[in-house]
């Protein structure tokens, strides 16, 4: 694994038994369960990521492939695969495995799966190649992905992630806050998606 040279790489501890952590992942499971049958598949997630989000963001075929590879690796670590239906208990157990795996890499300043995904996303919406994204670029992604459908929620996310107060977001800041939000319940990452995700 490559060194990320992250200035935010510190040991973070998960809190898997906290009902808030479980509810956060239940919300995401339901968000991903497009047809509401209580099961999700990697097919559904990749279709949303590639056919919907990447296409609407104007990703090139190379960017879409890189993004799809990152999404596949991330969700396969949770235990998902093509054609395999996963119910919530297995999904949340898979998140625990993923969190432990990624947090260990993060504490060693090595590239995690969430960082790979973040880099793939940044490559798509960092249109000017500056290595950072603006609030407007983040708002566009939030609307297209559905994760920050209101400007207010997108602005809250942006503020939470702008750790160096530069008015721009880089992938290192986004990775740190997403680790804190999805993996550990770090209070510094609470409200990452505004009022949309608990």
Swiss-Prot record:
Keywords: Calcium, Luminescence, Metal-binding, Photoprotein, Repeat. One of its GO terms (molecular function) is calcium ion binding. Residues 20-55, 60-95, 119-148, 149-184 form the EF-hand domain. The keyword Magnesium does not apply. InterPro entries: Centrin_CML-like, EF-hand-dom_pair, EF_Hand_1_Ca_BS, EF_hand_dom. Pfam families: EF-hand_5, EF-hand_7. SUPFAM superfamilies: EF-hand (SSF47473). Ca(2+)-dependent bioluminescence photoprotein. Displays an emission peak at 470 nm (blue light). Trace amounts of calcium ion trigger the intramolecular oxidation of the chromophore, coelenterazine into coelenteramide and CO(2) with the concomitant emission of light. This is Clytin.
């Amino acid at each position: 694994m490559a060194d990320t040279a992250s200035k935010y790489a510190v040991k973070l501890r998960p809190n898997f038994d906290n009902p808030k952590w479980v509810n956060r992942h239940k919300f995401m499971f339901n968000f991903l369960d497009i047809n509401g049958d209580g099961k999700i598949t990697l097919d559904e997630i990749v279709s949303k990521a590639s056919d919907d989000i990447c296409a609407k963001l104007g990703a090139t075929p190379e960017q879409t492939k890189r993004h799809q590879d990152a999404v596949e690796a991330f969700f396969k670590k949770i235990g998902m695969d093509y054609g395999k239906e996963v119910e919530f208990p297995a999904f949340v157990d898979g998140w625990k495995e993923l969190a432990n795996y990624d947090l260990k890499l993060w504490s060693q300043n090595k590239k995690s799966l969430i960082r790979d995904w973040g880099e793939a996303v940044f490559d798509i919406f960092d249109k000017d190649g500056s290595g950072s994204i603006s609030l407007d670029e983040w708002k566009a992604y939030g609307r297209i992905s559905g994760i920050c459908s209101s400007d207010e929620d997108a602005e809250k996310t942006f503020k939470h992630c702008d750790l160096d107060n530069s008015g721009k977001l880089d992938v290192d800041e986004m990775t740190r806050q997403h680790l804190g939000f999805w993996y550990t319940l770090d209070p510094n990452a609470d409200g990452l998606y505004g009022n949309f995700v608990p």
